């Protein structure tokens, strides 16, 4: 407030909140975090006409059209991380990366409470190429879990 007065005293017009909405649209992630101290989260999902996330046969790979798939690539490029549950990983074996040449892929995050992610999944096989986090809640140790941890520790 005092700075505004000093500036005004020098004959400079001070306009508060000038083009605020336009400025907020330039970087919504930053402004959201600064004002709320919470992460900016975007949820994307696809749904069939009957409100399901897969067809009656269980197929879920292409229930969206090409424009929606292009927007997904833009979203993946724009944001810092992409998260999927283990159910999606087991059903679809996704890559969770950006497929546009020259665009940066986000950190891939898999929520997997029991560490069921297959070692031959695309996510595990490509972990050297794309930063990947698998979050799990288990306390137990077995040979498979130890192997998955070793793979994770040798990756990025």
Model region roles, listed by residue range:
Residues 2-6:
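Short, small-residue-biased leader/transition segments that mark boundaries at the very start
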């Amino acid at each position: 407030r005092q700075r505004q007065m000093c500036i005004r005293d020098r004959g400079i017009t001070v306009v508060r909140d000038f083009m605020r909405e336009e400025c907020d649209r330039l970087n919504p992630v930053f402004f959201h975090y600064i004002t709320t101290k919470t992460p900016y989260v975007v949820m994307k999902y696809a749904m069939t006409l009957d409100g399901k996330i897969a067809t009656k046969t269980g197929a879920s790979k292409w229930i969206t059209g090409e424009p929606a798939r292009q927007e997904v690539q833009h979203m993946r490029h724009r944001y810092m991380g992409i998260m999927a549950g283990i159910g999606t990983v087991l059903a679809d074996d996704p890559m969770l990366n950006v497929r546009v040449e020259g665009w940066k892929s986000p950190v891939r995050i898999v929520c997997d409470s029991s560490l069921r992610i297959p070692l031959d999944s695309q996510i595990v096989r490509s972990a050297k190429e794309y930063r990947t986090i698998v979050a799990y809640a288990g306390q137990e140790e077995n040979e498979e879990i130890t192997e998955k941890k070793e793979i994770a520790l040798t990756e990025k």
